[in-house]
Amino acid sequence: DDCLNLRKGIYYIENLLLSDCKDKGINVSYNSKANIENLLLKNSTTAIYAKDSSDIYIKNAILKNIEYCIASYRTKRNYAGSKVKYKNINYCPESKKIKGEGSVINN
């Protein structure tokens, strides 16, 4: 149900278009690092989701028809929280962010 699942790695992605993701647009997990620049994401429950010791940096994103723009969690005890840092997202108010204990979301 996710468009892009990134696990246990380091990723650099430019010019990404994702559409009609049922659950998550981008899901980064299990101690991964993802740098994403120039993202267009449409029709998803959660646009950007980090979990379990993962870090995401997003620069230049356009999000359309999403329920939550960013979520950052720890779901497994053997991992720490996650971090999402972003710059220039068209629409991401605090009410559209979900942050779990020990996780960080900032711009």
Task: Describe the function of each predicted region.
Residues 1-107:
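Extracellular beta-rich repeat passengers
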